[in-house]
Amino acid sequence: MMEKLKSEQFPLSPSAEGCASPPRGDGDARGKQEGTTAETGEHRLPEELNGVAKETAHHATELKKEVAVIELSRRGGSADIKGRELKAELSHKVQTTELCRPPIPLPLPPRDPLSDTRMVQLSPPAFPLPARAMLYSNMTTPLATINSGFAGDAEQYGMYPSNRVKRRPAPYEVEINDGSQPKIVRRIFTNSRERWRQQNVNGAFAELRKLIPTHPPDKKLSKNEILRLAMKYINFLAKLLNDQDDMVGGEAPARANRDSRDATLVRDDLLQEMLSPNSSCGSLLDGDASPESFTEDQDSSVESRPSARGLHHSSLPLDGNAQR
């Protein structure tokens, strides 16, 4: 009866043995120990088979769980989050690159028409011609009008000062063979002529300075002082020549008295001119020996000689008359 019950229990609960029947079957077989080894072998075979089946079933469920986890992770896990982040970054990058790109057709800034008006207008104007003339007529002048001979009239109405337009030309501008630039060539010729004239004037003053006697021979004199001293020196030489002619001709004593009076008047005039505050040579009196004092000494010495000689000559006829 027990064997039948056991044989009936095993086929009836093959799945139940996977949950809780194997420990109870093992307890019955170990407690009673009634049956042959074949029966025990038959009893253990289903357990082993069931054990293997249990293990395989356990592994299968684990595989199913792992596959399900992988599938979940692939479908809605971190991969989906990363994919969404990548899509968001890509969309963000596309937006930034589109924003960073310059606008394709934008109107030119207001400074470009200024440069267009300066250069020769090869492109059509953006505004109608009257409006463009009203906007930029008082600001700049085109290059054609500047290079033409009528540029002087256009400079009066420009916003820029005349010193920017009237620049000093470079030497290479003379080589430009253009009929619209006679003004530049004329300006260069005028500058060279003025420079040559100034050099000639300076050379003439240097030569005149060498002829004027001064106490320090290398004394520095201005152009005004050189001219004043040259005039005085010329007057002194002219008087000296006149006195020599009078001495050779033997004129009357009245002429000698007149010459002496003239000499004293000239000396007084020279002193007043030197002492006047407007004279540029008055500052030279502070020195030890000024050129004017030197020339005045010469004038006084030379003028005193003819006066003395005239007096001596005048005394001779008086003596002759007395003897007669």
Curated annotation (Swiss-Prot):
**Superkingdom to which the source organism belongs:** Eukaryota
Which keywords are on file for this protein? Answer: Angiogenesis, Developmental protein, Differentiation, DNA-binding, Nucleus, Transcription, Transcription regulation
Cite the residue spans of the region called Disordered. 1-49, 276-324
Query: What are the GO BP annotations of this UniProt entry?
Result: angiogenesis; artery morphogenesis; blood vessel development; definitive hemopoiesis; embryonic heart tube development; embryonic hemopoiesis; endocardium formation; endocardium morphogenesis
The principal location of this protein is nucleus
Q: Where in the cell is it found?
A: Nucleus
Q: Which GO terms describe its molecular function?
A: DNA binding; DNA-binding transcription factor activity, RNA polymerase II-specific; protein dimerization activity; RNA polymerase II cis-regulatory region sequence-specific DNA binding; sequence-specific DNA binding
CDD domains listed in its UniProt record? bHLH_TS_TAL1
In this chain the bHLH domain maps to: 185-237
What is the reported tissue distribution?
Answer: Expressed in hemopoietic and endothelial lineages. Isoform beta emerges first, expressing in the entire anterior and posterior lateral mesoderm (ALM and PLM respectively), and in the ventral wall of the dorsal aorta, where definitive hemopoiesis begins. Isoform alpha expresses later as two pairs of stripes in the PLM and ALM, and becomes restricted to the intermediate cell mass (ICM) by the 18-somite stage. The ICM is the key site of primitive hemopoiesis, giving rise to the erythroid lineage.
Matches recorded under InterPro entries: bHLH_dom, HLH_DNA-bd_sf, TAL-like
The record's GO CC annotations read: nucleus
What's this chain's function? Transcription factor that plays a pivotal role in hemopoietic and endothelial development, acting synergistically with lmo2 and downstream of clo. Specifies mesodermal precursors to a hemangioblast cell fate. Hemangioblasts are bipotential precursors of blood and endothelium, and in the absence of hemopoietic induction cues such as gata1, tal1/scl-lmo2-induced hemangioblasts differentiate into endothelial cells.
Under what name is this protein listed?
Answer: T-cell acute lymphocytic leukemia protein 1 homolog
What does the organism's lineage look like at the top? Eukaryota, Metazoa, Chordata, Craniata, Vertebrata
Give the gene symbol: tal1
